[in-house]
Amino acid sequence: MFTLDSFRKDRTQHRQRQCKLPPPRLPPMCVNPAPGGTISRASRDLLKEFPQPKNLLNSVIGRALGISHAKDKLVYVHTNGPKKKKVTLHIKWPKSVEVEGYGSKKIDAERQAAAAACQLFKGWGLLGPRNELFDAAKYRVLADRFGSPADSWWRPEPTMPPTSWRQLNPENIRPAGTGGLSRSLGREEEEDEEEELEEGTIDVTEFLSMTQQDSHNPLRDSRGGSFEMTDDDSAIRALTQFPLPKNLLAKVIQIATSSSTAKNLMQFHTVGTKTKLATLTLLWPCPMTFVAKGRRKAEAENKAAALACKKLKSLGLVDRNNEPLTHAMYNLASLRELGETQRRPCTIQVPEPILRKIEAFLSHYPVDSSWISPELRLQSDDILPLGKDSGPLSDPITGKPYMPLSEAEEVRLSQSLLELWRRRGPIWQEAPQLPVDPHRDTILSAIEQHPVVVISGDTGCGKTTRIPQLLLERYVTEGRGARCNVIITQPRRISAVSVAQRVSHELGPSLRRNVGFQVRLESKPPARGGALLFCTVGILLRKLQSNPSLEGVSHVIVDEVHERDVNTDFLLILLKGLQRLNPALRLVLMSATGDNERFSRYFGGCPVIKVPGFMYPVKEHYLEDILAKLGKHQYPHRHRHHESEDECALDLDLVTDLVLHIDARGEPGGILCFLPGWQEIKGVQQRLQEALGMHESKYLILPVHSNIPMMDQKAIFQQPPLGVRKIVLATNIAETSITVNDIVHVVDSGLHKEERYDLKTKVSCLETVWVSRANVIQRRGRAGRCQSGFAYHLFPRSRLEKMVPFQVPEILRTPLENLVLQAKIHMPEKTAVEFLSKAVDSPNIKAVDEAVILLQEIGVLDQREYLTTLGQRLAHISTDPRLAKAIVLAAIFRCLHPLLVVVSCLTRDPFSSSLQNRAEVDKVKALLSHDSGSDHLAFVRAVAGWEEVLRWQDRTSRENYLEENLLYAPSLRFIHGLIKQFSENIYEAFLVGKPSDCTLPSAQCNEYSEEEELVKGVLMAGLYPNLIQVRQGKVTRQGKFKPNSVTYRTKSGNILLHKSTINREATRLRSRWLTYFMAVKSNGSVFVRDSSQVHPLAVLLLTDGDVHIRDDGRRATISLSDSDLLRLEGDSRTVRLLRELRRALGRMVERSLRSELAALPLSVQQEHGQLLALLAELLRGPCGSFDVRKTADD
């Protein structure tokens, strides 16, 4: 049986062999022919083992070096014999080696040589036991061991000439049989996926900048043709300098002309009997003839070809290493021409009637010195008081205004609680005894005597459900129940709700109203006094804004603190500082696993109470055991977890097979399957449904993910009917807090999604990585909570030893903008670095500074790190700062409802996408977007259609709409809840008169909601500087110039459009500018998944910052001062009017932010209405000369 240990043993042997490689230059490895020229048995065996040897060699080298073609690394040299053909294969990677092959035909000889090379590669460890390829990362390691690292980023040689071969001939030579340069550049070959992912692909202007820096020796000119016949000694010297001249000539011509053959451009004519005279006619780069002699035809031709190579080198068409230049360098003139076109500003064309309207408006409402300039806009003085001190304290338990109980009320309520407690009946006695119960006195005494206590309890000890009840019992039975108001945080919504329901059930009907929960979009708070409130960490953070000292709260219990999510670490900073403001408050940290002593030290050496848990026996199976059970004797191809965490992969078929095997042969009971993410959950669910077919009714397949609304997730706790097996497919959301009682089998993929932030590229990457050993323990424990169980780990035992003990805290690996904004809301007097340095694990100072700079860049913080007027508004809106900014601007620009939909859909995808139907979803999005060029407006139309069918109250119509548009009803319900929540936030931020206005078409805040270009422009203004400029032409890492391809340039560098955005496949873009919300890093490249084309005038008029103008009195250019992505040109009058219009819009925004929007004077509202009408009309106009054409294969 093939096991991981045997695989590693083989790999070690491979590495030992490759460490003992012979010197760089080896003698040819010969595959000897059989008598008569037939293929020998040994050769047939080789070809049987390597049936496609040439493709295999290309694939190995291509993957290792990250190139799509390996022509330069594999050179076949042919020699004609009397009865057989001989091929010498020159291999240039990983070492310079020659391999020979023979055959009756040239192709047979090539295949034999290639097969021999494959055998050599396998012996070096470059192929797996079954001749399979390795991943690129491993090849890089192998190459380093060879002392021949993979090619680095391509740069022009210092001697490469800064010109094009077209300049060699003033007549612009077009060789016979080709269409010349223009034809070759117009024909773009189809790009494969690997090339599309190349990190090194750059745009034309960047390449030209590099070329100017690195290139010093221009191409020498060659006017007209030439005829060269030299003495034989010169030809021999040339042949010594160029030992494979024909191959070099062919490569040069093929690269320069983008052709697959050089036959038409290099022609030999050989005459003579004893002495052969070879004439080489070279039609590129201009007609040239070379003559040489030799005893054999091949010798004469090689000498002539060597003379040609020498000539090309003198012209600068071959580099100093006698290798061809790149395609881009041969076509530098065209590159420069295209680069010059790209650098030109785009012409502004504003119709004369609109210009007159702008002049009239500015004449009536001049932008004078009374307007606050953009520089002053960053100051936070004299703003509308919208912060946490602007209103009465809020009761953290009920959410109502807080008023302390009088002494009489407290006594009365305490007595009432005591009576209710005594009337509970036998329910408490019926509750199962849990491991935490015998430790009740120790726990309660510690909490009473110490402000902070850490409770470390194993899985199943009952700390989550029982300790809040123990606290309540102690207070109630001592006659002070009214003083007991406990807030218990949970890391996830489903945990908060399910635990609250469990505790409510255990307390019984008489005290049920004293237990409640509050999560996003769903709330059922308890009555005040003797209250247990279960909520998410984010909810408690919001409560701290309106009650900074948590007055009215007796205890805060932070459960699952070991998970170290970013909100929990942030909460601990606040709670640590809160001890000085509210010394009576008791803090309890509860952890299942983790470094609990670290929490103790953080809170000054507070006590740690360890509670042993109880688990039923759990039998564990690892991958090698599982494969044996399934009758698989080797690793499935898609389930080879590589050593690099970046390349963890999961075979969904293996997961499905295992679940079916457990169902067929395992013990009765539920199956809980831990999967990395939503795509994997949907993939396994679809496979199970297909496999079960007509028997699906005997199974309850339940996905559990944060994408699913609470009402749909509650089904996992329900007992299935007799004869029905429950199969739960979950992320790590099911690892802690919640208990599904009938789970007997746990399938652990060993993987989860983890967000990581790249400081260099400033993008996040949601990676699939190995879990920690603590996660494995937690997952295993789900099978032994209520009965004996089984755990199936889809990784080898040896992998467990390599897993890290605990997860890296989220605060150390995620973007910090949201955290910094929260810090400014809670403690505005502290700098971000100062505040976050108080975390259990302080984040990188550079990461904090980057977050501060971004918030300053989007106008949320001023230079002193105080909240600006805009920041004060954003503080009320619970979403990403950039999305919150877009919402605020949408209220001001009166297009609010579509922006609420967009922001909600960026929070929760409305489409029912999976690994199998991505292409179909992309087609639906393209249809929904119409001709708007916007993924975001596709969201708006999808939700609008759903709201329309809901009004019909026709179930069939609703189901048809969902099916036709591949929409997911639970996500749409969640989006509806988000829109409602954001509406409340906007009302709290004084941006609308009442929450219902936000979705009312006739409300003033939605006056321009139908203006698509304005909606996209406002979204762009919120997301700025997330702006893309589309540029024509690119140069690949291999130096291939592709004039009909496009690159996507941002302020930070080049990015790629993901296939999921409709603009990726668009054959024509109406605008060169796109906006986007989020970029993610994958496989070394940065991708954008959502995008919208935006009008260039929207970019000019609606972005923050200054503009720069160059005006000669007749024509003027205007550009963004902080970016080179936008340069527009027009007549001086047009540019001047647009600049003043931009200032008028800035004044409107500033006025709106400095007072309650609905309370602005009527005259000001009318002025703003006229300005917005003018803006909408301007953006309705054509983009003029901003069209960009793309080839279909881009």
UniProtKB/Swiss-Prot annotation:
Residue runs in coiled coils: none
Cysteine-cysteine disulfides: none
GO cellular component, one term: ribonucleoprotein granule
Catalytic function, reaction form: ATP + H2O = ADP + phosphate + H(+)
Region listing for Disordered, in residue ranges: 1-27, 153-200
Positions occupied by motif DEAH box: 559-562
Binding site for ATP: 457-464
EC number(s) given by UniProt: 3.6.4.13
Segment forming the signal sequence: none
Sites of Phosphoserine modification: 6, 226, 380
Keyword annotations: ATP-binding, Cytoplasm, Helicase, Hydrolase, Mitochondrion, Mitochondrion nucleoid, Nucleotide-binding, Phosphoprotein, Ribosome biogenesis, RNA-binding
Gene3D superfamilies: 1.20.120.1080, 3.30.160.20, P-loop containing nucleotide triphosphate hydrolases (3.40.50.300)
Domain Helicase C-terminal: from-to ranges: 654-827
Molecular function as annotated in GO: ATP binding; ATP hydrolysis activity; chromatin binding; DNA helicase activity; double-stranded RNA binding; G-quadruplex RNA binding; RNA binding; RNA helicase activity
Compositional bias (Basic and acidic residues): 1-10
Domain DRBM residues, every copy: 53-121
Family: Belongs to the DEAD box helicase family. DEAH subfamily.
Quaternary data: Identified in a complex with TFAM and SSBP1. Interacts (via N-terminus) with ZC3HAV1 (via N-terminal domain) in an RNA-independent manner. Found in a complex with GRSF1, DDX28, FASTKD2 and FASTKD5.
Function field: RNA-dependent helicase. Plays an important role in the assembly of the mitochondrial large ribosomal subunit. Associates with mitochondrial DNA. Required for optimal function of the zinc-finger antiviral protein ZC3HAV1. Involved in nervous system development and differentiation through its involvement in the up-regulation of a number of genes which are required for neurogenesis, including GSC, NCAM1, neurogenin, and NEUROD.
Identification of the protein by name: ATP-dependent RNA helicase DHX30
Species name: Rattus norvegicus
Upper classification of the organism: Eukaryota, Metazoa, Chordata, Craniata, Vertebrata
